[in-house]
Amino acid sequence: MTLNEDELKSFSQCADDQPVVMINLLKFKTTTESGESGEAVYTRYAQNAAPFVAEVGGKLIWQGKADHYIVAGEEDRWDKVLLVEYPSRAAFLQMLQSPKFQEVQKERLAALECAALIASTSLK
């Protein structure tokens, strides 16, 4: 899982006049290199990341377990879905660029088999 630099650049250049909701689709590793479950490691990451999210005005607005796939391919099997709202794109980018947050991100990477992070804004 790597950051798509072209998408991130495009994201940063969009109008920044409304909140942005980051849709997180997560598939956990069964077992991480440390021997813990991916879900346990991700839970620790989420606890450690929460202060960074709050610091820029972000908030978790919904989370849930992905339990039925009415329309999806085999590769689209996620374990968890999170919606995190930020007051602006700039706020999200500020958090992303924090060296301390980048350190915390290592747990996220250790926990996940794969993930998707989709930026979304409200239709006006």
Give the location of each predicted region:
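Short S/T/G/P-rich N-terminal loop/turn motif that feeds into the first structured element of a domain
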Residues: M1-D79, P87-A91, T121-K124
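Short, Lys/Arg-rich amphipathic alpha-helical interaction segments
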Residues: L83-E85, A90-K124
